[in-house]
């Protein structure tokens, strides 16, 4: 896996799924391919994106700044600086300085990532802040190692909380989660339908599922009543895909 592919993988792992994620993936690909060279416009676009947490915006801003060539005097952006200040915790800053000294002696991406993984996400973000604010310099490879370690720490905690939700025995949460997934699958079916001949059928199935979810939410139902809803929808989606000759395993 190339270095930039690895960076893109880690960064996208902390962006919530949805149309915005696809848009960010496209921007990262363009930046890494040297197709997008207007850093100021890119940062302005990033600053105004909804949904993203300040830290995710900070990390993306750091990656864009590292990658896009810019004039030396270009102003640092406040929204990135604020996100990478380790929540203003002096302990994070102390650890960030110690980490920076170690990274300064490192020259490889994997070496830097290995060192950084033993620090907390707060200390890692503060260390990125030091580099972003030009208080310290490391090689681009080392900076990318720091980025990937930070994303791995964040993705790990997201995965833990996601797993807790998936394995929860609370029937109300499981019921709501099934309905949310059914709605998301319905939306995916509508997007895939496009202008094909079978589109009407797909739209019909998706529309029925949406109406059912809305009705369930409006009148309130027993938590076990949604058990088959998502499975039925996925079955319909897969049957539709087979007829279309499309295989999109990611909806499983």
UniProtKB/Swiss-Prot annotation:
- Membrane topology, from the record: Peripheral membrane protein
A single Gene Ontology CC term: virion membrane
Pfam families linked to this entry: Flu_M1, Flu_M1_C
Q: Which domain of life is it from?
A: Viruses
Q: Where is the protein found, in the record's own terms?
A: Virion membrane; Host nucleus
User: Cross-referenced InterPro entries, in alphabetical order?
Assistant: Flu_matrix_M1, Flu_matrix_M1_C, Flu_matrix_M1_N, Flu_matrix_M1_N_sub1, Flu_matrix_M1_N_sub2, INFV_M1
List the keywords (alphabetical): Host nucleus, Membrane, RNA-binding, Viral matrix protein, Virion
Q: Where is this motif: Nuclear localization signal?
A: 101-105
GO terms of molecular function: RNA binding; structural constituent of virion
Q: Per the UniProt entry, what is one GO biological process?
A: viral budding from plasma membrane
Q: Where is this region: RNP-binding?
A: 165-252
Extract the ranges annotated as region (Membrane-binding).
1-164
The record's note on quaternary structure and interaction partners says: Homodimer and homomultimer. Interacts with NEP. Binds ribonucleocapsid by both interacting with genomic RNA and NP protein. May interact with HA and NA. Cannot bind NP without genomic RNA.
The miscellaneous remark of the record is:
Most abundant protein in virion. When expressed alone can form virus-like particles in transfected cells.
Its function? Plays critical roles in virus replication, from virus entry and uncoating to assembly and budding of the virus particle. M1 binding to ribonucleocapsids (RNPs) in nucleus seems to inhibit viral transcription. Interaction of viral NEP with M1-RNP is thought to promote nuclear export of the complex, which is targeted to the virion assembly site at the apical plasma membrane in polarized epithelial cells. Interactions with NA and HA may bring M1, a non-raft-associated protein, into lipid rafts. Forms a continuous shell on the inner side of the lipid bilayer in virion, where it binds the RNP.
Q: Which family does it belong to?
A: Belongs to the influenza viruses Matrix protein M1 family.
In Swiss-Prot or TrEMBL terms, this protein is called Matrix protein 1
* Gene field: M
